[in-house]
């Protein structure tokens, strides 16, 4: 694990989504300790650290470029900002390294940053033309999008695009990819985007409100970075690190991720978990959290006008009210 605090890199403009709503959900307390599992360029982290005196924050990101930019942005907070280069599912390792046994609040903002989307060489976007990469951590040994596109089977590609991208044309797109790579490898985002666009039926292209490659690129990015697995592993652990009164806020941009967060929070808020045929509760299980909003919080008109990428963002948050009774 690499602890990083850079003060040499110039920051790139990036607007954090739902900034006011996220801070309200976390309700930071003076002297509290907070975890930002998806640090990005430090927008939410800066707001948390500025919100009350004496706050400390542990910020994680597997994108070294973003981590360096965040380090520069947060340098004015000195030793109150602790930054680590790691996956957010490995947050316990970072907290243990700091000697923390609890955090008063935790935040995830699960999306691709403007930094990643706007730099063609990162391979996340179908606008521009860059290498097929899509790895959040470009120095990792994990297979890139190039491997997925040029080496995986038709069935695996189809399943990936259909499941993670929720793409109705997954079969046509996977077939087009497999047929094309038999002639030449598909090396760039531009090549892949054009291939996907041609695979779409003309009638679908004519009425499409977004680029035909949107869902395919999303699916490949999620597969390359194991994004659902990351989220599942985080949710399985985080509640044990919150004290009574501690809060968790999660911002998602994709229906599969939002569904996973919603299901986890519903599970935590359950009371009795006895089988239905038992007439009286014998498990004694009590709700572990209270859900802070009846519906997910979404961006208002002003934010959408300033940042169109906030349109699909959904914020869900809980407050811990009891320890797990062990049932």
Curated annotation (Swiss-Prot):
Annotated S-adenosyl-L-methionine binding lies at: 42-44, 61, 95, 109, 116
Statement: the UniProt record of this protein carries the keyword Cytoplasm: yes
Gene Ontology terms: biological process:
rRNA base methylation
Main location per UniProt?
Answer: cytoplasm
Q: Which InterPro entries match?
A: RsmH (IPR002903), SAM-dep_MeTrfase_MraW_recog (IPR023397), SAM-dependent_MTases_sf (IPR029063)
Q: Name one Pfam family in it.
A: Methyltransf_5
Enzyme nomenclature, EC number: 2.1.1.199
Arranged from A to Z, the UniProt key words for this protein are: Cytoplasm, Methyltransferase, rRNA processing, S-adenosyl-L-methionine, Transferase
> What reaction does this enzyme carry out catalytically?
cytidine(1402) in 16S rRNA + S-adenosyl-L-methionine = N(4)-methylcytidine(1402) in 16S rRNA + S-adenosyl-L-homocysteine + H(+)
Q: Name one GO cellular component term.
A: cytoplasm
What is a single molecular function from GO for this protein?
Answer: rRNA (cytosine-N4-)-methyltransferase activity
Compartment(s) where it occurs, according to its Swiss-Prot or TrEMBL record:
Cytoplasm
Summary of the function given for this chain in its UniProt record:
Specifically methylates the N4 position of cytidine in position 1402 (C1402) of 16S rRNA.
Question: What does the sequence similarity comment in the record state about its family?
Answer: Belongs to the methyltransferase superfamily. RsmH family.
The protein, known as: Ribosomal RNA small subunit methyltransferase H
């Amino acid at each position: 694990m690499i602890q990083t605090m850079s003060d040499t890199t110039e920051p790139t403009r990036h607007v954090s989504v739902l900034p006011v709503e996220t801070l309200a959900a976390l309700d930071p307390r003076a002297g509290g300790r907070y975890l930002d599992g998806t640090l990005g360029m430090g927008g939410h982290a800066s707001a948390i650290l500025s919100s009350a005196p004496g706050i400390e924050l542990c910020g994680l990101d597997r994108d070294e470029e973003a981590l360096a930019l965040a380090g520069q942005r947060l340098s004015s907070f000195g030793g109150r900002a602790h930054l680590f280069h790691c996956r957010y599912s490995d947050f316990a390792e970072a907290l243990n390294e700091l000697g923390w046994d609890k955090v008063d609040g935790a935040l995830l903002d699960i999306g691709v940053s403007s930094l990643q989307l706007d730099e063609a060489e990162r391979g996340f976007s179908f606008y521009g033309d860059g290498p097929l990469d899509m790895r959040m951590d470009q120095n990792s040994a994990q297979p890139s999008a190039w491997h997925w596109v040029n080496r995986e089977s038709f069935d695996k590609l189809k399943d990936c695009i259909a499941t993670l991208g929720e793409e109705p044309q997954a079969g046509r797109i996977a077939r087009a990819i497999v047929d094309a790579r038999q002639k030449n490898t598909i090396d760039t985002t531009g090549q892949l985007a054009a291939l996907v666009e041609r695979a779409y039926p003309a009638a679908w292209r004519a009425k499409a409100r977004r680029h035909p490659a949107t869902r395919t690129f999303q699916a490949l990015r999620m597969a390359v970075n194991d994004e659902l697995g990351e989220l599942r592993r985080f949710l399985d652990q985080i509640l044990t690190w919150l004290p009574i009164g501690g809060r968790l806020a999660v911002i998602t941009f994709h229906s599969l991720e939002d569904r996973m967060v919603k299901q986890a929070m519903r599970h935590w808020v359950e009371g009795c978990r006895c089988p239905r045929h038992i007439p009286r509760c014998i498990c004694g299980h009590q709700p572990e959290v209270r859900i802070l909003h009846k519906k997910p919080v979404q961006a208002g008109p002003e934010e959408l006008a300033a940042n169109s990428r906030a349109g699909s963002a959904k914020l869900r948050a809980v407050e811990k009210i009891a320890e797990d009774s062990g049932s």
